[in-house]
A protein has these predicted regions:
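Conserved active-site and cofactor/substrate-binding residues in soluble primary-metabolism enzymes
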Residues: 15, 19, 35, 39, ...
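Catalytic alpha/beta active-site cores
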Residues: 57-240, 244
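Short acidic (Asp/Glu) and glycine-rich catalytic loops that position anionic groups and cofactors
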Residues: 1-4, 45-50, 196, 234, ...
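Catalytic-core signal marking the mid-to-C-terminal active-site face
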Residues: 10-23, 31, 36-43, 57, ...
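N-terminal leader/transition segments
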Residues: 1-104, 445
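Glycine-rich anion/phosphate-binding loop at the beta-strand->alpha-helix junction
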Residues: 200-370
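Flexible, glycine/charged-enriched surface loops at secondary-structure junctions
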Residues: 34-41, 52-54, 131, 191-193, ...
């Protein structure tokens, strides 16, 4: 996985941080946070917090006391130890797109299927730059709703040997994911000692944690599995239009969820989540890759470090309907501040289209290229006698060229990043090769990767036990 040792880009002054601190404290004490779960309300009552109906009015010092119990950094194991990940510090881990109900393949936009889910999972396995296939890479609408989480989890566990994300639609789905993890890794003790999944728990912003998300949180936290407590903020819709107000709300929501996770299981690993963008004030549509979202992302990194927490943000986000120039520049507008801020867990790193409604096969490849280039750009320079190349100057002298110099010949294969997607051909050669644009080249690449895909090995007995579990649970769920 990638370690980003570049300096973090911090934009908030000490005075600004103090103002934000006052803001979130006032929100949790005067407005409060709704928890649509009696179990959660009872935990807060027992901890001495003021509860009125479903609203908890939190003591900020109590919140910080709970947050301090969460680890600053932690490990997550994959079934292939080479793909274990570290969350926190300089580490950055990247996962594929999450949640779209539709897919785009070429000119066709359609409902996602289980076959699409499997193919995206296979693509995620085939690129080393991705540390995880994610979770719901796309929503397989051709499978029964009550049991499709079983098929998705089985695919993630068998078609990749990387870290996977847990299903969070309900507590039942979470229990199934945990049970399958126990099969894959050898029991409850094994997954509690070193967690095996990461699960996304979204806040129903503004200031409400709903029952389904909380049911899943209770299951995963009790099992010691990391959860990403994520305020879902589109400024102008789920938060006020100003970035400072959105940041204050984000802190209040994230820390209140993290506090609950620590009440469920003290020391449970958590990630400070952030999904922060804005709407088009003329149409009301969500917009992505905006300057405001990038600035909010930079602020979020600084805020999370202030609280001693790893954080999730960023991704190759775009509002574009197709893998065009807009899709590329908006994705970069989000991914560049992701690196500048040093986000530790990055969802939606490959495949996001149309505001998250669509998983795009060609866009997946474009995003992988962007991600590979950024990792190369954020790798520190090695400056030593060899890299200063004084001998090359002695060899070439004045007015010559370095193409044939020994220093060049020793390094020409690896001295520069070699793009898999970009074209640097002259116009005539590009036309002779069909005049194919980036989307067309991306199509060839993903098709080739799928043809060359090799499924990672898995013990036959473990595979059989997983498959038997899926069959049994599907029958119990009535599907």
């Amino acid at each position: 996985m990638f370690r980003n040792t570049m300096p973090r880009y911090e934009v908030l002054s000490a005075d600004a941080m103090a103002q934000l601190d006052k803001g979130w404290r006032r929100l949790v004490t005067e407005i409060g946070v709704e928890f649509m779960s009696e179990k959660a309300l009872e935990l807060f009552r027992s901890a001495g917090q003021k509860v009125e109906e479903n609203t908890v009015f939190l003591d900020p010092d109590f919140v910080l006391e709970q947050v301090a119990k969460a680890p600053r950094e932690f490990d997550v194991q994959a079934r292939n130890p080479a793909h274990n990940i570290h969350i926190g510090g300089d580490s950055m881990a990247f996962g594929s797109v999450y949640g779209p109900p539709f897919v785009r393949e070429g000119e066709v936009r359609r409902d996602a299927t289980m076959d699409d889910f499997r193919r995206f999972t296979m693509l995620s396995q085939s690129f080393d730059v991705l540390d995880s296939a994610g979770g719901v890479i796309c929503e397989p609408n051709d499978t029964p709703l009550d049991s499709r989480h079983l098929d998705m989890t089985l695919a993630l566990m068998t078609l990749t040997d990387k870290v996977y994300m847990g299903n969070v639609v309900s507590g039942v789905n979470a229990r199934d994911t945990i049970a399958m993890g126990e099969i894959l890794f050898g029991g409850r003790a094994a997954i509690e000692e070193t967690p095996v999944s990461i699960s996304l728990i979204n806040c129903n912003s503004p200031l409400r944690w709903d029952d389904r998300m909380l049911d899943a949180l209770f299951e995963y936290a009790a099992a010691g599995q990391p959860c990403v407590l994520t305020p879902f903020l589109l400024m102008g819709a789920m938060s006020p239009v100003t970035i400072p107000a959105a940041l204050v709300q984000q802190i209040a929501e994230a820390l209140s969820g993290i506090a609950l996770a620590q009440l469920i299981r003290p020391g449970c690993p958590v990630i400070f989540g952030s999904f922060l963008s804005n709407i088009d004030m003329q149409s009301g549509s969500p917009t992505f890759g905006t300057p405001e979202s990038g600035l909010g992302l930079l602020c979020t990194g600084q805020i999370a470090r202030h609280f001693g927490l790893p954080f999730r943000s960023g991704g190759a986000l775009t509002s574009s309907q197709v893998p065009d120039a807009q899709a590329g520049y908006e994705a970069l507008m989000t991914m560049l501040p992701t690196f500048l801020a040093g986000a530790n867990w990055v969802m939606h790193s490959a495949g996001w289209l149309e505001g998250g409604l669509v998983a795009g096969f060609e866009k997946f490849i474009v995003d992988v290229e962007i991600l590979q280039m950024l990792q190369a750009e954020f790798t520190p320079l090695e400056i030593d006698e060899a890299s200063l190349a004084f001998d090359a100057h002695q060899e070439v002298g004045h007015g010559g060229h370095f193409l044939g110099a020994m220093h060049t010949m020793e390094r020409f294969r690896t001295c520069f990043y070699r793009p898999m997607l970009s074209s640097s051909e002259n116009y005539e050669r590009w036309m002779r090769n069909g005049g194919v644009d980036a989307a067309g080249r991306a199509k060839k690449i993903y098709q080739q990767r799928l043809e060359e895909y090799e499924q990672p090995t898995l013990d036959d007995a473990v595979r059989q036990e997983l498959e038997e579990y899926v069959v049994r649970r599907r029958a119990e769920l009535g599907d």
